[in-house]
């Protein structure tokens, strides 16, 4: 008997959805940063074992949108809860349910498939706190399963996989067994660069950073030559991203190259520039160019 199912992971921004997906896959597939809303596109990630295949839709965090990009991200996350076989609602036990959590719960009540409550970061919180949070959420809605985990340390991840297998239906293998992601290489390369920029810039530049890959060519020796722009919204952000004597941009390129080489399994040369595009997050045509679907 072979089973297959589509799973979506929801939760407020920065709760650890991408880290959980990485722990399940044991691969660095989804951009992980300390900043909220760093996952912008629905990324279908495929886990294939001997007797099942799980297709994960990694979504942006659900939040109150402030611009066109925010609207896209919220709609993307809401749409992902439709037509799936299982929903994982990820929370942190050290945070009481806020308006964002209550908003998600109201949507989850309309879902016709099993919903798991997954408590992350249990290694960072006392058992009493975890138990208290469990009680609060259990009174808000009924969950098919409640699983405490540590995504970062991999605690109870195997248990979570076993429970997901239990709930998904019998079905075909939708993707080849060696396929782990349905996004193209350019998309992943752009996400790697953006992650490094977000990490290195910390609080110096607001969240309005995007990456466009201008060129990605592989020569006869198997070496990739990549060129791209880091987009920011204000002229004042540009020198911050570049850094003194180009030091910051050089570090972004260096750290990104290391991860891109690991992903492509090839030597990589990468050149990056910084370009100002004011209010790009409200520019529908530019969002489309960067790979964000048009809002319906």
Swiss-Prot record:
Residues 37-41 are annotated as: G2. It comes from the Bacteria. Residues 120-123 are annotated as: G4. InterPro entries: G_ERA_dom, GTP-bd, GTPase_Era-like, KH_dom-like_a/b, KH_dom_type_2, KH_sf_prok-type, P-loop_NTPase, Small_GTP-bd. The keyword Protease does not apply. Keywords: Cell membrane, Cytoplasm, GTP-binding, Membrane, Nucleotide-binding, Ribosome biogenesis, RNA-binding, rRNA-binding. One of its GO terms (biological process) is ribosomal small subunit assembly. Residues 11-18 are annotated as: G1. Residues 201-278 form the KH type-2 domain. PROSITE patterns: G_ERA, KH_TYPE_2. NCBIfam families: era, PRK00089.1, small_GTP. Monomer. HAMAP family: GTPase_Era (MF_00367). Belongs to the TRAFAC class TrmE-Era-EngA-EngB-Septin-like GTPase superfamily. Era GTPase family. This is GTPase Era. It comes from Clostridium botulinum (strain Langeland / NCTC 10281 / Type F). The gene is era.
């Amino acid at each position: 008997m072979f089973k297959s199912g589509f799973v979506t992971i929801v939760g407020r921004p920065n709760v650890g959805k991408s880290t959980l997906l990485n722990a399940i896959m044991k691969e660095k597939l989804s951009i992980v940063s300390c900043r909220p809303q760093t996952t912008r596109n629905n990324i279908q990630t495929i886990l294939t074992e001997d007797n099942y295949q799980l297709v994960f839709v990694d979504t942006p965090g659900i939040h109150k949108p402030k611009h066109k990009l925010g609207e896209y991200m919220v709609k993307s996350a809401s749409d992902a809860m439709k037509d799936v076989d299982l929903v994982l609602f990820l929370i942190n036990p050290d945070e009481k349910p806020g308006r964002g959590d209550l908003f998600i719960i109201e949507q989850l009540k309309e879902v016709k498939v099993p919903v798991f409550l997954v408590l992350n970061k249990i290694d960072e919180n006392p058992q009493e706190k975890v138990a208290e949070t469990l009680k609060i959420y259990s009174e808000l809605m009924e969950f098919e399963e409640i699983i405490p985990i540590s995504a970062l340390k991999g605690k109870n991840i195997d248990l979570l996989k076993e429970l997901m297998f239990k709930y998904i239906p019998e079905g075909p293998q939708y993707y080849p067994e060696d396929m782990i992601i349905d996004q193209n290489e350019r998309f992943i390369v752009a996400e790697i660069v953006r992650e490094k920029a977000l990490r290195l810039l910390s609080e110096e530049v607001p969240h309005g950073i995007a990456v466009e890959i201008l060129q990605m060519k592989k020569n006869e020796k198997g070496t990739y030559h990549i060129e791209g722009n880091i987009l920011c919204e204000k002229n004042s952000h540009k020198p911050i991203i570049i850094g003194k004597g180009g030091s910051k941009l050089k570090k972004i390129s260096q750290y990104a190259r290391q991860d891109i080489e690991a992903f492509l399994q090839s030597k990589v040369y990468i050149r990056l520039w910084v370009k100002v595009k004011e209010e790009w997050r409200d520019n529908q045509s530019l969002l489309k160019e960067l790979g964000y679907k048009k809002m319906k």
